[in-house]
Amino acid sequence: MSWFALSFGAALTQATQFALVKGRARGIPPLVIVTWTQAIAAASWAAFFLVSGHAFALPRFAWPAVAVCAVLVMGMSGLLARASARGDISIVGPVFALSPIFTVLPDAALSGTWPSPLGWVGLSLSVLGTSTLSGSGTGWRGLAALFGRRDALDALGAALLLGLVAAVDRWGARTIGPASYLLGSHGATALLAGLIAVLTTPAGLAESVRVRNVVTLVGHGLLGAAGTGMQTTALTMAPAAYVNAIRRMSSVVAVLLGRALFAEPDLGRRLSAALLACAGAACRLLAGR
């Protein structure tokens, strides 16, 4: 399977997670959502090793990368969960699509890859699209108005962290293999988030075992495991900025789901912004050829 197909599959699971959190998990603390999601993903990869007979290997030199990834993923996933639950997913999706911008420097440092000139055009298109989301003009004025919204600001923070996560994931997956790296990183993130959840929101953690919440969290976790697996495998085939560029297509799906399921406003403007992000993704794809 090509890196494009894997990245697009990850985009679809991401948009579905946005909708699932807004529709069924608004009352669940973000840190609890992160704990469950990462634990289910770790269990899924552990099952893969048990069934397939593949050898798990996480050498000591990779431990720092796993630890860094755990901190970054906990922050990123927590911000995304909060933004999706409290805001408009048709805003969250397009803003989160800015993540390739924050991938460029760390990816260059860890993997030695830079965008081509056409790739830079793609990044510029995504910024232009994002600046129109607020309805207060374009450029800096539009961006300032947009990031006055809490959901947009949370999504921007998540996009920044995803840019860093993607670069670390690319290094880890290429160095020790996607499966071993993912089991290690998901497990570490689940332990870290779970410990902090026990200390800061024990009531929320206890409430999460109700049947309705369990169904929601397991579904969210399985989507996350599938999406992360597809993305990390794609990262072994292409630069992180290219993979994240295709994942930006989740912004279009998020806008459409937001309108269809939650009657979110400004469909035309938000869809235009998401389509500009996709145009940027197309530039990145062409630049990779």
Segments the model singles out, each with a brief description of its role:
Residues 164, 177-180:
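Generic multipass alpha-helical transmembrane bundles of integral membrane proteins
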Residues 1-8, 101-160, 170, 265-289:
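Juxtamembrane helix-loop boundary signature in multi-pass membrane transporters
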Residues 68-73, 82-130, 182-191, 240-260:
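Specific alpha-helical transmembrane segments that line the substrate/conduction pathway
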Residues 15, 19, 46, 70-75, ...:
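Hydrophobic/small/kink-forming positions within alpha-helical transmembrane segments
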Residues 1-68, 75-87, 135-154, 187-220, ...:
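Membrane-interface interhelical linkers
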Residues 170-174, 236:
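Short amphipathic helix-loop junctions that connect adjacent transmembrane helices
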